[in-house]
Amino acid sequence: MADSDSSSEMPAHSPSPSPIPCAKQKPPNTGITISLLEIGSLPTFCCSSFSEPNNNMCPIRKQGKVQKFSNLLKDVKDVLKNIAGFEEKTTDGDPFDDTYIPEDLSELNIRGFDKRNKLRFKDDLFIHFDPERENTMRQEMLFKSHSAKNMVQKFARDLCNSEEKRGCDGVQLNAKRRRTGSVHIRGEYRKLRNNMEQLLQEADHWSKQHNELSELMRSYQECHKEIKDIVDCSRVCSQTQNNNEVPSKQKLEEQVKKLSQDTHSLHLIAALLENECQILQQRVDILRELHLHEAGPGHEKPLQTSGEQDKKCGEQDKKCGEQDKKCGEQDKKCPKLAEAEKMDGSKHTMKTTEGTITRKPKIFRCPNDCLTKKARNNRFNARVAKKSLVGKRRTISSFR
């Protein structure tokens, strides 16, 4: 729209030959890194600047002018497209080529040319169109196309030269790398061999140590087994000893009980023997008195002896009475034992009386004296029996 408005307001001039055939001639190698013009919509001030003086302009001239500008714009667009394609090809290559241009410099050049082209385009719009200027423009375009061709050829030559140089440099570098690499590889190979030898030596050393450790482990296991066997044997022995100690203790306790019973029975037997000895002594005394009465005419001596015996018997009766009191007090404390002692005493007295009765002499001159002696003997035997029973009871309680 902006192009049509500007073309309608331009002044009328004689038609000039169209620049289409010369402008459409494309260069064979369009590989330039410099842009000529940024195409866009024309500014609004261009339309307003030519409004009044161009009202009397013919429509035919206006149409020719519009076609000319449209053709120029198309040519510029084609050139820019070719330039953009060539730039993409160059950027796809190696960035270290000799023909590589940094982006900063290319942007600065593009900006400078853009400004110049815009100024020229504005001058063309403000100034009336002249055929001389159009010819100059054609010549400039031709010159630019020739220069572009020359630049492309130069760029191609430079690219070829740079590739050849790079190829030569690469070959030289590869040769140098091979030489240096072979030396480096030999050094590394020697290091690897040394390391392998060291590793083999260490492996031998470790194998020896492993064998020694295995032997030590075996010896340790054997010692451990022996210690276990000894501990098990000691446990078994201790258990057997404990099991044997229990019946041995029981046997000892039984033997101690038997010994205590035997000692108690021996004490009883000793007490009975003492009683029998006393009874025998009394009988011996009685027999002496009888012999004295039978043999001697005098009656004074036996009477004296009988009086002395009566005194002795009285003293014994007193002692027996005191003992009877003590036994009575003890019998009150334990009545069951007292009853058992009475039964034993009665049995013992019966036996003693039977023995005494059988052994008594049948002939006595004084029966009263004999009766008193018998009674005393019986009392004495009963008291001795009681004493023996009391001693037996005490021994049993002490053992308990």
Curated annotation (Swiss-Prot):
UniProt region (Basic motif), positions on chain: 128-193
Region (Helix-loop-helix motif), start-end ranges: 116-127
Keywords, ordered alphabetically: Coiled coil, Cytoplasm, DNA-binding, Nucleus, Phosphoprotein, Transcription, Transcription regulation
Major subcellular site: cytoplasm
Post-translational modifications reported in the UniProt record: Phosphorylated by MAPK1/ERK2 and MAPK3/ERK1.
UniProt region (Leucine-zipper), positions on chain: 252-273
Residue ranges that the Swiss-Prot or TrEMBL entry lists as coiled coil: 182-231, 268-293
Gene Ontology terms: biological process: positive regulation of transcription by RNA polymerase II
Keyword set includes Transcription: yes
One GO location term (cellular component): nucleus
Highest taxon in the source lineage: Eukaryota
GO molecular function: DNA-binding transcription factor activity, RNA polymerase II-specific; E-box binding
UniProt region (Disordered), positions on chain: 1-27, 295-332
Places the protein is found: Cytoplasm; Nucleus
PTM annotation (Phosphoserine): residues: S106, S207
Subunit details: Interacts with PPP1CC isoform gamma-2.
Biological role: Transcription factor that binds to the DNA sequence 5'-CANNTG-3'(E box) and the G-box motif. May play an important role in the regulation of cell proliferation and differentiation during spermatogenesis.
PANTHER family membership: SPERMATOGENIC LEUCINE ZIPPER PROTEIN 1 (PTHR47889:SF1)
Further comment found in the protein's record: The helix-loop-helix and basic motifs form a SPZ1 specific bHLH different from the classical one.
The protein, known as: Spermatogenic leucine zipper protein 1
